[in-house]
Amino acid sequence: TELTLKKLTQSLITGVGLLALFGCAPSGQQSAEPAPTLSLERIYTDKEFNSERAPYFRWLDDGSGYTVLEARSKNTQQTDDDSHGVTGNDIVFYQPDGSGRKVLITVEQLTPEGADDALSIENYQWSEDGKWALIFTNGQKVWRHRTRGDYWVLNLESDSLYQLGGETPKETSLMFAKFSPDSQKVAYVQDNNIYVETLGSKNVTALTTDGSDTIINGNFDWVYEEEFSITDGFRWSPNSKAIAYWQLDQSGVEYFTMINNTDSLYP
C-alpha cells in the first residue's frame, strides 16, 4: 500500500509538471486565430457569400449548341511602362456536351472603324439565314428595363459593322430592333414611330409618322410594362411583307400633379 501511494504521488507530480510545461508554451502556439465576425458589410457590401451565376447564354435555333460572351483582350501590346489594348467580349459557340468550342464573332469584328473599344454587348441575335448579327449596346432605362439604346449589325461574310438608324444615326434612340424573317431588313422603334431599314444599303422607310408624346406606336407605356410585363409592341409577318403593331392613343389621359414629400426632411 505504501509503495502504491508513493507511485501515485510520483505520477501526480509528473502530471503537474507537464501541465506547467505546456502552460508556459508561447501564446501563438496555444490557440488558432479567432474566426472572422459575420457582418452586414461582408454579406451586402463585399458580397462575400454571393453565389456565382451561370453566364448569359443563348441556344441556336437548330439546337446544335449555344453561344456565350467571353471576355478577351484585343491587340495587346506590351511596352516598358504598361500594357495597352482593347478589351471586349467574343461570342463563342459550345456544343451541349462540351466537346466543341468555336469563336463565332471576335472582339476585332465588334470594334467600329476608328474606335478604341469594342462594342459593349448587352444583347444580340442572329438573322434567320445566319449571315448577320444584331448587337444591342449603350442601353438606357425607359421605365424599369433598358429598352432604348444603339443597335449595330455585323455582316458575318464581309465583316462589315455599322450602326442602324440611317446615314446619321441618333444616339441611344432605337428600341426593339429585330430581323425580318427573310433576313433582308431590320425594323425598330424610334421616337414612338416604326421604321424599317434595308440591310447593307441603310435605306430607311418610316411605317408610321404620327408618333408623339400621346400617340405611341410599336411599344407600350409604363402601365403595360409594370402590370403585364409587355414592352415590345410590333411583330413581323412570316413572309416579311407586313408588320403588325400596337398603337396607344393617350390624348385623353390627363396629367395628374403629385407632390413629392419624401425628398427632404421638411416641406
Predicted features and spans:
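Bacterial N-terminal signal peptides that target proteins for export
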Residues: 2-13
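Beta-propeller folds
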Residues: 11-15, 24-267
